[in-house]
Every structure is written in C-alpha cells, then in structure tokens.
C-alpha cells in the first residue's frame, strides 16, 4: 500500500527533482508507518492491535511499574423493577434471572464498548512501547473462558462482602490479576430479605482505557443491555453476539491524539509550540515546589506498606443548588471554588509549609474531548476516545502568612483564589494543539516514573543506608491536585426497547454511583462530580505515604469551605466582592 502511494507521487512529479520527490516520499512513508501503528490493525485472524499513544502509554506503564496504580473501581447501585404481574419478586429465581441478565449484558458490552475487552502490555521496560490488543470472540468456549476470568458474582453478606464498600475496597487494594489487565465486572446480589432488592456492580478497569468523562457511556450501554435481556432457562447459557456486535472495528477505542491529528492536521510550528508550553509547565513544578503550599508525605515511608484508602464526602442537592447560586453571584464556577478550597485546606492541614510559601502549585485535569468532533471524519475509523483527560499545573499566588481556615470572614480569600485558578487554567484551554504535546509529556512521565521507582526499590532494600535527606529527595513535598469530572451522566432510568416489555412495567433504576481507584504513590488528588444533583468529593491515597487522619482533615476542610459558600448564597451581594471578575469568560473554561 505504501509502495503504491510512493509510485503515484513519483509519476505525478513534474517540476520537482527526483531527489526532492524521494525525500518527500520517504518522509511520507515514515509518517504513514508511524500513524498505522497507533491505529488498530489486524495482526492475525480476529486479533487487532495498536500502540498506545500519549497518556494511554504513561497510564499503562504507571499501572505496571506501580503495582496497579490508578486502576479504577467504579461502583453503581441499581434495581430491576419487575412487572406488577411478576411472581418471582424476592425469590431465588429473580436472582438467577438477574445474574443471567448481567452476564449477557457484560458479553454485549465487550462488543458494543470494546474498551471493556481490551488487553494491555504488562512490561516495565521504558524503552519498549506499550501496546493494546483486542481479540474478537466468536464461539461459546472462548466467551465462557473470558467470563470465567472477568465476571464475578457475589451475594451481600458473603465473606468479604459484608457491605458493597468492602468488596470495592478489595478491588482497589490489589492489582488487576487478569491476563493483559483486562477489566472485570463484579455483581453483588441483594439478600433475599432486602425489600429494596438493590444490586451493585463494580467495574474494575485500567485508567489507560477510560476516564471520568467516558465511563458513563459504558454504564449506560451495560444497563440498557441488562434491561433488554430476556433471560430464560437454562440461566447459565452463553449469549451469542449478533452480526452488528461482531462488526466491532468502528467502535474500537481510539487515541485522542490520533483523532486530533486527523481533525486538525497540525503544522510543525503548532506542534513545536505545544511542546514548548508543556516543557515550561513541567519545569515550573520543579522551580516552584520549594515555595509552594504542599502535602507532606511521612518521612517513614520506606518502612511502611502500601494500602489504598478512599474517602468520600457528599453535598446534598439543596446544598448544591445554593452553592451554584453563590458561584453565579461571584461570577465563578463550582470547579474553581472547589479547587481553591482544596488549596486553602491543604495550607491548614500542612501548616509547616506556610512560612516558606508564596503561593501554591495545583494540578488540574482538563478534557481534550472538548476539541474533538463527535462525528467520525473517516467511516473506517472509530470515533470513541475513552481516554481524553490530562493534567496541567498552575501557579496560584496566595498570602500564606495568615490563617486560611474555612470561615465566612475569609470568603474573599477563597473567591480571589478561585479567580486566579480560572485565569491560569484558561491559558491551557485556548487551543486544541496542546494535544500535540501528549506523546512528549507521556514519554517524560515514563522516564521519570522509571527513575523514581528504581530509587524507591533501592531505598527499601535491606542493605540500604539512605539518609533522611536522600529519602526526602525521592518522595518530597507534593502539590495538591483537583479533578473535576462535572456531571456524571449515567442515566437514572432504563426502559426496555421492546414495547411489550415497557408496557409490562419492567424497568431498571440506577440509584447511585461511586468513583474510587487504586493509589500507589505519594500524590493524592481530590476529585469531584455531580450525580443526580448531589456533589461527591472523593479522595484516594496510599497510607504508605500519608496518614489517614491528615487526609480526612484535608477533605473535611474542603467540604466545609463548600458548605460555607452554600450558606453564604443569601448574603453574598454585600459580603463578597466580585470586582475584576470576568463574567464573560468562555464557557469552555469550565471543566
């Protein structure tokens, strides 16, 4: 195919010298080869493969070298409302049918949302590319083998499942054990005496193939398949995928970098500028860390064991309405107020940093899908880009030589900090060409991770005699981070496609969602999302590096700031100045 393209170029050349043409053709061939490896290509019958690109690569490498770091455990609670004429409600037969429904839906999701079935490399060689592959399963035997590895059914009250949270904690306190880090689905059945008949699903998945902006699409697909399934005896039979489902290539997960390159065709100068901006951002972390507010890991971390703890706090819908009202009154957004609260709360949780600080570094997540067309530009290429997020760091000036404890009297400090965050973040949301820097940033991250984990292993070896200064040089002060997912768009109600089934009164109600994950590093971030009008603030961290008490204090202070904002909504017009706040800032600046 490439040779044919070269011949066409040569035959059409008129005024160019042959040398110029050959040089151009060589560059074109190299570019085509490079592009091909990042798009799905068939390597054998029913086996597709591509090279990870950008943050897919660094997420996969991080997962490998850090024993499962950032693997997600995403839990939903839900119930199936049976038709009023049903006689199986509250029976073992209802649970048998529930298992059959979810098993079929999990199989269908593997074809309809292929990231569910993707396999990733597990090596830790920084010089070898990370790749992903997808095997198309056609026969009952291979599907059953995949189910045996990835689908687990538990009942509430079983050992290790006293509560759904207990099983969820199990999933994020061990790395995925499946071959190629394939994702898993846990189904927790209700007790027979549970009048609400609430079931739970936990999707345990690599962060390399999903993020907070795309995971809702998987759950929406899964639950629609659950309610559309028509279980019948024998309930352990294996679903046979349809011809449409088997035509999986158009739905395969695509790198957001490749989608960007196809849509925008960046010029060399645009790529170079993006690399420069990214380089400056990474260098700023080193330059500013010494004068920044920060989280302080325990100095005894070499002797401690890894354990992930996930904390969650919730603002009720009425509080969220008042919080939104306050944000509008001060011409800000909940994302900016919450990230400002994260910084100020870190200052008082680790006050030992205040005297030497002139402000704060803060990591913020941005979503590249804001710039990517939802419509495929090439019918042969999939439009799904399930990993579209990355992080940038901002420098926020703050007067640290005073108390920053949550208080109504210090509301102006919070609003001013939120204003600075918005101003700085806007600088990173002006052009899609920032996506050009993702491969460069990812490669830098991989090299840094490899070096850091080599140092960690050396310090933890029995023969190590490292000083406290050397230990602090490996794991030192950590900038706080904030990730705003926005609205979690998992639908609350799912009705069957079949008109007869709908008319019978059969439907599925999704009642809650919780976002947790495995943390095996010293840099905890607070995340925030809105589900059903409620805001959840969540914090996952590694007790090897951080004390549970300190992390509770950090999250609690952040939530107190949010509640103060909500309570202040009625009096803001006279209490908090909005001078110099730009009310016309672009909508896309909101995460």
UniProtKB/Swiss-Prot annotation:
Annotated region described as Peroxisomal targeting signal type 1, given as residue ranges:
589-591
An annotated Gene Ontology molecular function? acetyltransferase activity
List its EC numbers. Answer: 2.-.-.-
Instruction: Assign the protein's first listed, main location to one coarse class.
Output: other
Q: Which UniProt keywords apply?
A: Acyltransferase, Peroxisome, Transferase
The annotated pathway is: Secondary metabolite biosynthesis
Q: Which organism is it from?
A: Mycosarcoma maydis (Corn smut fungus)
User: Does the keyword section mention tRNA-binding?
Assistant: no
Question: Any idea what this protein is called?
Answer: Acyl-CoA-dependent acyltransferase MAC1
Per UniProt, subcellular location reads as: Peroxisome
| Superkingdom field | Eukaryota
GO BP terms, alphabetized: mycotoxin biosynthetic process
Q: What happens when the gene is disrupted?
A: Abolishes completely the production of mannosylerythritol lipids (MELs).
Free-text note regarding domains: The C-terminal PTS1-type tripeptide peroxisomal targeting signal is required for the import into peroxisomes.
Concerning its family, UniProt says: Belongs to the trichothecene O-acetyltransferase family.
Job description of the protein: Acyl-CoA-dependent acyltransferase; part of the gene cluster that mediates the biosynthesis of mannosylerythritol lipids (MELs), surface-active substances that enhance the availability of water-insoluble substrates. Mannosylerythritol lipid production is responsible for hemolytic activity of Ustilago maydis.
Q: Which GO terms describe its cellular component?
A: peroxisome
Biotech and industrial use: MELs not only have high potential as eco-friendly biosurfactants due to their excellent surface activity, but also have attracted considerable recent interest because of thei runique properties, including self-assembly, anti-tumor and cell differentiation induction activities, and moisturizing and hair-repairing properties.
């Amino acid at each position: 195919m490439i040779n044919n393209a070269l011949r066409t170029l040569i035959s059409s050349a008129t005024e160019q010298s042959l040398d110029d043409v050959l040089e151009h053709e060589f560059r074109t061939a190299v570019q085509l080869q490079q592009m091909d490896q990042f798009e799905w290509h068939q390597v054998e019958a029913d086996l597709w493969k591509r090279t990870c690109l950008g943050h897919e690569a660094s997420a996969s490498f991080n997962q490998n070298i850090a024993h499962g770091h950032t693997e997600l455990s995403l839990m939903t609670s839900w119930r199936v409302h049976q038709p009023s004429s049903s006689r199986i409600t509250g029976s073992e037969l209802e649970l048998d049918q529930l298992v059959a429904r979810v098993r079929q839906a999990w199989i269908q999701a593997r074809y309809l949302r292929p990231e569910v079935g993707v396999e990733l490399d597990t090596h830790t060689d920084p010089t070898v590319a990370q790749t992903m592959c997808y095997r198309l399963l056609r026969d009952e035997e291979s599907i059953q083998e995949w189910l045996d590895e990835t689908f687990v059914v538990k009942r509430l009250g079983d050992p290790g499942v006293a509560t759904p949270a207990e099983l969820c904690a199990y999933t994020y306190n061990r790395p995925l054990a499946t071959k190629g880090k394939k994702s898993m689905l846990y189904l927790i059945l209700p007790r027979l005496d549970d009048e609400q008949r609430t079931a739970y699903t936990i999707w345990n998945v690599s962060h390399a193939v999903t993020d907070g902006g795309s995971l809702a699409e998987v759950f929406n697909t899964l639950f629609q398949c659950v309610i559309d399934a028509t279980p019948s005896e024998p309930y352990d039979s294996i679903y046979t995928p349809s011809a449409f489902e088997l035509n999986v290539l158009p739905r395969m997960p695509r790198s957001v970098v490749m989608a960007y390159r196809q849509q925008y065709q960046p010029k060399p100068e645009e790529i170079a500028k993006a690399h420069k901006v990214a380089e400056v951002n990474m260098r700023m972390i080193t330059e500013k860390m010494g004068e920044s507010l920060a989280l302080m890991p325990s100095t005894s971390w070499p002797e401690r064991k890894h354990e992930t703890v996930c904390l969650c706090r919730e603002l009720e819908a009425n509080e969220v309405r008042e919080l939104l009202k306050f944000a509008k009154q001060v011409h800000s957004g909940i994302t900016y107020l919450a990230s400002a609260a994260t910084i100020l709360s870190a200052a008082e949780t680790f006050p030992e940093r205040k005297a030497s600080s002139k402000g704060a570094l803060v990591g913020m997540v941005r979503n590249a899908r804001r710039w990517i067309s939802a419509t495929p530009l090439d019918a042969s290429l999939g439009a799904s880009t399930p990993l579209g997020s990355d992080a940038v760091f901002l420098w926020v000036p703050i007067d640290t030589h005073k108390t920053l404890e949550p208080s109504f009297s210090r509301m102006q400090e919070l609003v001013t900090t939120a204003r600075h965050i918005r101003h700085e973040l806007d600088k990173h949301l002006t052009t899609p060409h920032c996506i050009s820097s993702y491969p460069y940033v990812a490669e830098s991250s991989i090299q840094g991770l490899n070096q850091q984990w080599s140092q960690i292993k050396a310090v933890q070896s029995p023969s190590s005699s490292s000083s406290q200064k050397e230990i602090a040089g490996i794991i030192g002060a950590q900038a706080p981070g904030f990730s705003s997912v926005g609205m979690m768009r998992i639908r609350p109600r799912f009705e069957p496609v079949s008109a007869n089934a709908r008319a019978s009164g059969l439907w599925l109600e999704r009642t809650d969602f919780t976002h947790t994950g495995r943390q095996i590093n010293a840099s905890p971030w607070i995340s925030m999302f809105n589900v059903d009008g409620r805001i959840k603030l969540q914090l996952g961290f590694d007790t090897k590096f951080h004390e549970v008490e300190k992390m509770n204090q950090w999250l609690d202070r952040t939530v107190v700031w949010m509640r103060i904002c909500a309570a202040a909504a009625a009096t803001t017009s006279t209490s908090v100045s909005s001078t110099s706040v730009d009310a016309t800032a672009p909508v896309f600046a909101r995460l």
